[in-house]
Amino acid sequence: MIVVQVKDNEPIERALKRFKKKIDRVKVLKEVKSRRYYTKPSIKRREEKLKAIYKQHLQQQANG
């Protein structure tokens, strides 16, 4: 469970920002969104393969 202690005289916006950062680091929302619907293993593999190809293409573009 993610807990954020609100300090004395700290604006709630700042505490909320720290809470959101902690959630992003733990990748809670990403996992919840991915589990919302069932995706077949073949589709997962296809998406991972396309993502790897895309990353490789970007790396080649950066290196020249």
Curated annotation (Swiss-Prot):
One biological process term in Gene Ontology: translation
Matches recorded under InterPro entries: Ribosomal_bS21 (IPR001911), Ribosomal_bS21_CS (IPR018278), Ribosomal_bS21_sf (IPR038380)
GO cellular component, one term: ribosome
Keyword hit for Ubl conjugation: no
Gene Ontology MF annotations: structural constituent of ribosome
Lyase in keyword set: no
Keyword annotations: Ribonucleoprotein, Ribosomal protein
Domain of life: Bacteria
Family the UniProt entry places it in: Belongs to the bacterial ribosomal protein bS21 family.
Record's protein name: Small ribosomal subunit protein bS21
Natural source organism: Amoebophilus asiaticus (strain 5a2)
